[in-house]
Every structure is written in C-alpha cells, then in structure tokens.
C-alpha cells in the first residue's frame, strides 16, 4: 500500500463523520519513510469530547482496514514536543483552517520558548564530550 493509498482511504473514512473537524496524519507515513511494519499515526480534533470508546472504535476500525497498528491522538490533549511533532510534518486529511492555525501557533510558541533551553543543553553536552 502506498502513502497516497493510505491518505485516500483515511479521507474516505473520515469524510462521513461531521463531529470530527480535523484529521492530521503524522509520523513515518506522513514523512514518506514508512515500511510494511510501520504504524499509522493520526491526530483528531472533534467538536465533541473524544471518549476512550470513540478513540478505541476508530483505532480498531482503521487497524482492520489497514492491517497494521494505528495510533490515534486527541489533538486537544497534545502538548509540547508531541504537538510540535504532529504539526511540523502533518498531512491534512480533513482540514479546518482556524483550528489548524491555532494548534500550529501553539506548537510554534512552545518551540520558541523551548529552543534556548535545548540549545543550552546541547552546548553543555558538547562541552562535556570535548572535555572528556
């Protein structure tokens, strides 16, 4: 199954669900680096709360459809590096611009706040490596 096959089947699956406003494909399939054993990672945004039962139903149906493991994340609960990971390589399966922009900005603000800390940590590690 190709990357485009996965995208097309996800679009078809979610096209009939009006409660789910946005679906983002991320991870190795989104990047095009997947293999036959790779899982499929999707993040959902819903008008209604995504209960465990709803997420489990979607996960199970998609696992059967694709015959591979499916990871389903609730975008409302995604934060920090996880949200940044989703938003930086997302393929838009079902798209709502206002919602997308809100979460992209949230991820960007996190990255901008976290970047100085990350750089300082990397510099300290490099100094330790160079100094033995």
Residue spans for each PLM region:
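Catalytic core of pol beta-like nucleotidyltransferases
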Residues: 1-22, 30-32, 47-132
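Short glycine/proline-enriched turns and hinge-like loops at secondary-structure junctions
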Residues: 35-38
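Short hydrophobic/aromatic beta-strand micro-patches
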Residues: 43-45
């Amino acid at each position: 199954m190709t990357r485009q096959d996965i995208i097309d089947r996800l679009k078809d699956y979610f096209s009939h669900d009006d409660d789910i406003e946005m679906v983002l494909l991320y991870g190795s399939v989104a990047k095009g680096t997947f293999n036959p054993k790779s899982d499929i990672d999707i993040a959902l945004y819903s008008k209604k709360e995504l209960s465990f039962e709803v997420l489990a139903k979607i996960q199970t149906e998609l696992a059967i459809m694709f015959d591979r493991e499916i990871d389903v994340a609730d975008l409302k609960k995604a934060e920090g590096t996880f949200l940044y990971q989703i938003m930086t390589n997302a393929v838009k399966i079902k798209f709502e611009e206002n919602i997308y922009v809100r979460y992209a900005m949230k991820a960007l603000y996190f990255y901008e706040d976290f970047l100085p800390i990350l750089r300082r940590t990397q510099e300290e590690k490099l100094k330790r490596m160079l100094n033995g």
